A protein has these predicted regions:
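Alpha-helical scaffold segments in soluble metabolic enzymes
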Residues: 4-7, 51, 110-114, 168-171
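N-terminal FAD cofactor-binding segment of flavoenzymes
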Residues: 1-28
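Rossmann-like flavin
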Residues: 34-139
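Active-site-adjacent bridging/hinge elements
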Residues: 140-144
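Helical element adjacent to the flavin cofactor pocket in flavoenzyme catalytic cores
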Residues: 103, 113, 145-185
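Residue-level detector of beta-strand face positions
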Residues: 30-32
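Residue-level preference for nonpolar/small residues embedded in alpha-helices
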Residues: 1, 62, 164-165
Length: 185
């Protein structure tokens, strides 16, 4: 289970599975290229490397290095700084050396390109900013942490669609006598 959902339900001594049915996906994304090549992107590292090797053997090592580097970004940007408010310039200034070391001045695409040579693989491995409305060519490489975040926790599907997550949260809130105001801005 995605830990944030589980953590929320645990606060109320409830099991998320009683409210929301999430199932881990085996294939996360399917990329179909102009030339007909298909890449099934997943959490299965052996399968990922095999598919990368079929496209460009030299990029397997680059992929492994990219994953290691995105773990460093994840450790800093998600694990360490996710709860830090950047409401004062000094707080941000203290993080500058770390952010520079993590190449935050590069775009996601530029970071990926420093490890991956094949253009198909570059586009595939730099697509993560699109998930949050960003442009891989201009979004800071800090968003590369999404690549590692997926590897750490996987990608899940809400059975019945995302609306069922809302329904499950609403049910929990009603049981906890939390006032809901609906139909208003």
């Amino acid at each position: 289970e995605p830990y944030l959902i589980e953590e929320l339900f645990t606060l109320f001594n409830k099991k998320s599975q009683d409210y929301i049915k999430l199932t881990p996906l085996k294939t996360w994304y399917r990329f179909i290229y102009e030339d007909g090549d298909v890449f099934n992107y997943s959490g299965d590292e052996d399968q990922m490397k095999k598919q990368i090797e079929e496209i460009n053997k030299e990029d397997v090592r680059g992929y492994e290095q990219l994953v290691k580097f995105t773990k460093k970004i994840f450790d800093k940007g998600f694990t360490e700084l996710a709860d830090v408010p950047f409401d004062k310039p000094l707080v941000m200034m203290k993080q500058l050396p770390s952010l520079l070391k993590l190449k935050s001045y590069k775009s996601v695409y530029s970071l990926v390109s420093s490890y991956i040579k094949n253009e198909k693989l570059r586009r595939m491995l730099s697509m993560h900013p699109l998930l949050v409305g960003g442009n891989p060519f201009t979004t800071t490489s800090i968003y590369g942490l999404i690549l590692y975040l997926e590897k750490k926790w996987g990608i899940h599907y809400s059975m019945g669609g995302t609306g069922n997550i809302i329904n499950g949260l609403e049910k929990l809130m009603i049981e906890q006598e939390i006032e809901l105001i609906k139909g208003h801005e």
